[in-house]
């Protein structure tokens, strides 16, 4: 059964009608694995405040839980204690909970009507994993989908290891202060300021969207959402959060973790070259590869204008649609890679980058931790 996500989340959402605009994104990674305080990403997002309208903001940080590096850090929002009790029963049946607590926040006049926000550091119970015949990651994905589709008023919004997603209805900088991000240290940060155009502003619909260690922030509109959603359902993913970006997080998990595609190849699935360009490609091997990808993964092609920044355990990437209908800028400084909607957001925290460029349409910008980190 899939619970209809509507009335039970009414107090977490704000509908203002459709207003064309563009979200704001920023991502930072230290390829040497140096951890940075959360106020850095907050300041970058503050610079592009006007790209959002206060109906959603959020962040993901990697490396923030070194004391629980081998545990899944499960962040959950609950509408009420009844949903919390039902969810915790499912968690205790499936997981060994090492530690649980309310996610630390601080009072803010800018963030209102917050749900109950809890985090659980846990490991799958070996007997349950064996009985299910699944790997730990697959077991966790199935558990997340079960909770999100069957427990009323409950949503798992982060489920990776040594990382966490923090999001709410509000401007990004206010969300960051609400969740006390300056107290966290991460080697990768991604941030998002939302301006919803087709879907409601509510807590679960804020970005980033996450599954396991994949976290996605997105500016644009995924017109292929229906096809992508039906394709993902064949592999056990359920889209319940009223926002098209959700499919992007699940597609990265499916293509790279489940199907084992290299990151660069997965990007060529999502932002595939046009047939007219494949037909005239003079590199026969490349032509064969792109033809095969489009035939095998046609339903994973993401159509529409988009710019995304994706965080994962050992890296970060930025990717545009194949026509570049949304802005995306990249820069480097020493071991740092920056990706953002605007150069100004990068220069706010890195006034003199070594290099600044606009990535080509459909060409990923990838920063990964060095091998010994």
Over which residues does each language-model region extend?
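Conserved short alpha-helical segments that host acidic/polar catalytic motifs at enzyme active sites
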Residues: 1-373
């Amino acid at each position: 059964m899939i619970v209809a996500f509507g009335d039970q989340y009414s107090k977490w959402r704000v509908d203002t009608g459709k207003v064309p605009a563009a979200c704001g994104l920023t991502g930072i990674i230290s390829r040497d694995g140096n951890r940075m305080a959360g106020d850095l990403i907050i300041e970058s997002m503050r610079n592009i405040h006007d790209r959002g309208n206060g109906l959603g903001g959020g962040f993901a940080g990697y490396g923030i839980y070194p004391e629980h590096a081998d545990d899944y850090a499960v962040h959950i929002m609950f509408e009420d204690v009844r949903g919390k009790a039902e969810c915790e029963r499912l968690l205790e049946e499936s997981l060994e909970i090492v530690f649980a607590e309310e996610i630390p926040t601080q009072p803010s006049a800018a963030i209102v009507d917050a749900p109950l926000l809890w985090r659980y550091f846990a490991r799958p119970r070996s007997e349950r994993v064996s009985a299910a015949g699944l790997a730990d990651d697959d077991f966790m994905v199935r558990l997340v989908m079960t909770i999100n589709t069957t427990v009323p008023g409950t949503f798992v919004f982060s489920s990776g290891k040594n990382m966490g997603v923090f999001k709410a209805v509000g401007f990004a900088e206010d969300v960051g202060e609400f969740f006390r991000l300056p107290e966290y240290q991460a080697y990768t940060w991604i941030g998002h300021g939302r301006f919803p155009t087709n879907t409601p502003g509510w807590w679960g619909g804020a970005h980033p969207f996450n599954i396991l260690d994949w976290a996605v922030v997105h500016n644009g509109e995924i017109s292929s959402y229906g096809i992508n959603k039906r394709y993902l359902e064949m592999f056990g993913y359920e889209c319940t959060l009223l926002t098209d970006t959700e499919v992007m997080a699940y597609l990265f998990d499916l293509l790279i973790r489940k199907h084992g595609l290299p990151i660069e190849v997965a990007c060529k699935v999502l932002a595939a070259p046009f047939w007219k360009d494949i037909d005239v490609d003079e590199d026969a091997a490349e032509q064969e590869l792109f033809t095969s990808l489009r035939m095998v993964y046609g339903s994973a092609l993401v159509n529409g204008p988009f710019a995304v920044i994706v965080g994962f355990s050992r890296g970060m990437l930025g990717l545009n649609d194949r026509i570049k209908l949304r802005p995306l800028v990249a820069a480097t400084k020493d071991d740092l890679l920056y990706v953002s909607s605007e150069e100004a957001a990068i220069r706010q925290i890195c006034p003199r980058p070594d290099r600044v460029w606009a990535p080509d349409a459909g060409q990923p910008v990838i920063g990964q931790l060095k091998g010994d980190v």
